[in-house]
Amino acid sequence: MSESIPKNIILTTLDDAINWGRKNSMWPMFFGLSCCFVEMMGSMTPRFDLARFGAEVLRGTPREADLMVIAGTPFKKMAASMLRVYEEMANPKWVIAMGSCANSGGMYDVYSVMQGVNQVLPVDVYIPGCPPRPEAFMQGLMTLQEKIARKESPARPVLNLRGGNEGTTVPILIDGSSKTRDTRGPGYGHCPIRGTAQQHPDFKGHRAAGMWGPPQPKIAFSASTAPLLEQLRERFGDDVRQEEGADMPTLVADPAQVPELLRFLKQDIDQPYERLEDLTAIDETARSQRPAHDLTMVYHLLSFERAGYLRVKAPLRNDRAEVPSITGLWPAANWYEREAFDMFGVRFAGHPDLRRILMPEGWQGHPLRKSHPSRATDMPPFTRDTATTMVPPEGSHFFSNRAPVDNQSLSILNLGPQHPGTHGILRVILQLAGEEIVDLDSEIGYHHRGAEKIAERQHWNQYIPYTDRIDYLAGSLNNLAYLYSVETLCGVEVPPRARYIRVLLSELFRIASHLVWLGTFAHDVGAMTPVFYAFDSREKIFDIIELITGGRMHPAWFRIGGVPDDLPDGWLAAVEAFTRDFEARIDEFDRLLTGGPIFRARTEGIGTVSRQQAVELGFSGPNLRATGLAWDLRKSMPYGGYDEFDFDVVTAGGGDCFARYLVRLGELRQSLRIVRQAAEGMPQGRWISDQYRYAYPKREDGLQDIESLIHHFLHVSRGPAAPRGECYRAIESSKGECGYYAVSDGGTGAYRLRIRTPSFPHLQALPQLSRGRLVADVITILGSLDYVLADLDR
């Protein structure tokens, strides 16, 4: 070797050569669980260009993948499927835990969530953040590359010799043994919890419940309410009682009377209540002033003609927790009643298929009962053995109780719970005659994060970050929906400047959400280009949002009474630069898709629903407006200052996938109009309310007077005490109507918080939209509905 080595010759070891090839051509499995996966997808777009690392092509089957990125929350119901995918992956293989939830459960120490995926899978690299930015994911990938290059010796295993190592070699962690069960999460070893050794860290030590507070302010009802109440007295007499509702007219009836009362309200009155808005229950057993009954069934109805809501309540006792089903009156009631059965144990006589919907079939107890544990760390440790008890049932199980189809040879096709076409962890089971869909069922709950249960242990302000993660593509729109209900409950007036800031951010997030939908929907039907344009524009929106709030997907920026800070220097120039260019980008989307023969063939006449069917099924938002009904809460029931803006309600005819596309494309233009108006007309003045009983005081006020300082201390520690009462309010979110039903017992947090999301009724309609279509059409229909799994399962 005395001669010099030519420049085109490289000397290395076999270990280094194998490691070099592996680390520069990672094959990630397509495995998205939650919010983090959206940021992971962002790393594959032009701004970040993951292709530089040779890892930009996600594999649709585990047999072609060697890297599993647990991007998002690891759910207990998903554990068995997660293990199955991992076991089918090629060797050697590696695991990255992306985000706080995957690392440790994050902010979701709740009954349905594993406190870290490392309880069932070995993890090579942990990426912090909630969610991590695309840059953080790329840093995690480089960390894994470095681990492969420095710590693995694959030559001997490759040559079938003893010794060496490759792939993941770390052990899984045992909850409570090799892994902490501290309710505050990892990293607190040997750090004492607050209070004494005899005191639970969640002790209720404040005096808010015993202090005087103002009553809930009463909203003036419409003039049509009095004639309606008179009609009810004539028809039902004393069988239906009026309750003193402060937010909407409220009726109380015995359970047996409920179906007839609801039928009367839907069919027999002028200006009927056509849509079942929501159906839920309240466990009354922990009330400070406990009523005689144990449970209350609550029905919320919507009248399009009255532009208003009505509430019906039915008291129940634990020993007779049964009410007649109303699925014959509203098909949308099917899933709502199953959820009430699952979460509360309420039975519905006459329901066609009463079974659990969110929790696994073998789950013990009903999670929204006050007696059910809230925290995962208060329950037995979750292990691989536990996961084996939650294996999803066979596909044939879902059709075993249905009438057989004569003279057809049928097959079962399982789609999900992990499939690129389902846009998240959702299982769709198809019953097929050849390629034609005879019947269809959905298994949901794989993304259930216990959001409503968590609200019962957080104070009103602490819960705001959790709302960001309901529809994790809608950002501040979630905050607005929650705060609209809480502010109405408390009677808080939001200053004009704060209203405009909220509208500005909400419409930017509406555009960002529609862009993700547009790009992925186009991709579903074979158009590859739009998704890159869509994510490019989305990143420009996030630049503005980050400038104003400091965050991207989940800024948690709204507060009771306004926003936490004023707009920063440079915000107007950033908004104007975006609005100047984005209109041309909308035109590009229009040219790319609207006239495309393949796009139209895949979408026109597919997944058709009439206006009447859409109302019966609980549709809202763009999916409802695609049937020709011009119903938009921003116009029909204005809130948050939207009555000060000039924009059109976009509708389309046909009620098919193409009509739903046209509505959302048009809404991009209308939201752009609103953003421009908000920027140009931004008023001066306060950005947070001066009603400091409920709102955070401005910093300078806290430095000037003791009252403001005391309120700030109380709001940060125990939280504001809301009046005893209840309030349901909804907003027009990007996917439809998102409403919060806040029930207060006079304390600093919700006694019961119900979240009415648009994704839940929309996905319930999938069988009606799909029967008689082909398998390929299901992917198109799913995409056209625009749902998010966290919005669906909460």
Swiss-Prot record:
Q: Where is this chain primarily localised?
A: membrane
Q: What is the recorded name of this protein?
A: NADH-quinone oxidoreductase subunit B/C/D
Specify where the region named NADH dehydrogenase I subunit C lies, as residue ranges.
230-383
Under Gene3D superfamilies, the record lists: 3.40.50.12280, Cytochrome-c3 Hydrogenase, chain B (1.10.645.10), NADH:ubiquinone oxidoreductase, 30kDa subunit (3.30.460.80)
What does the subunit comment say? NDH-1 is composed of about 13 different subunits. Subunits NuoBCD, E, F, and G constitute the peripheral sector of the complex.
Entries under SUPFAM superfamilies matching the protein: HydA/Nqo6-like (SSF56770), HydB/Nqo4-like (SSF56762), Nqo5-like (SSF143243)
UniProt source species = Syntrophotalea carbinolica (strain DSM 2380 / NBRC 103641 / GraBd1)
> Which reaction is this enzyme known to catalyze?
a quinone + NADH + 5 H(+)(in) = a quinol + NAD(+) + 4 H(+)(out)
Record's InterPro entries? Answer: NADH_DH_suC, NADH_Q_OxRdtase_suD, NADH_quin_OxRdtase_su_C/D-like, NADH_UbQ_OxRdtase-like_20kDa, NADH_UbQ_OxRdtase_30kDa_su, NADH_UbQ_OxRdtase_49kDa_CS, NADH_UbQ_OxRdtase_CS, NADH_UQ_OxRdtase_20Kd_su
